């Protein structure tokens, strides 16, 4: 098979050499270092709000909007353009991340742990079930083997399940509202929602697919009022987390934040900004919970830079992504900020910055920093077990010193976990969540 048949680096056929000049290549990749904030975005002319068109389509009988109701106990936040976005805090349907479950299991576990700590009842206040699929966004962005129609069908299939999932547990349609764990899914779903609202042709095409799958309600597709990311839930719950659950003083911990491009650069008008966080200039996510917990939030010069993952670059240009991660992120937060930890809010970012630090050692670049999600750091501060819940043993970056600096004995936690594993081997398993609920039971 020729290169022009399969595309460069094994990608789809439409990925062909561009032969760009150096200045053209720099312009084409400027998003890597792009600044998206209140200072650099033109806020003068009001952008189109896709939600307004959703209400019109619903009135015309085209779609059903999955609404956030008072039962979801929403908290209103402000986005980049000053628009109001509603974040539900209960009755949540967990839309899991394939990368988190496979590479960073302590990421979703920490989130579920928090809901349990708040007294949320599984099957009533939240649902974590297996009847869902990957968003498949990486297939599209990473390898070029997907298309918008397939992405839209997957989006609608999963959000239909969220809409109807409460029925088998004795609730009404729309009881559980989707909470998206992955930043890539979050950005992809927001783009796809916009395409669906704008294109009658796309809606008709996916309707045929969903009809065959039994994923229509009264012959209509279901689109959520808001696309909500888990870190937005953490943001609106941050004061309750700090006020009700925090057990460890983290005022001596130097925290740096990497905000995911997929969160605030894709469909940037939907990202949360807060005047009490970073002056309201940068997205508040992640930083806000570290700030609420009392940690020292330290700025650094490459805050806006991509983590290095870059969708398909992690597959076909691994050396570039690893060197970018080490030189534009890890080195900077270590040398400029002297960070104790680098937190983030996306699957790909955490994976890239955590798993690739070994490459620095291979090239005698002896700098490293613990990397974890905002919700994992928050869970540690609230007394979650570093091994059973936060699951730092899955991380490749060195987390031992951070844990010790927080006043938690890594050695004792490891011994306790090893003893727990023997209990598991003996069949005495401790569940965070009823496994029958995950499979549709009660």
Residue locations for each model-derived region?
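Iron-sulfur cluster-binding electron-transfer modules in prokaryotic oxidoreductases
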Residues: 2-442
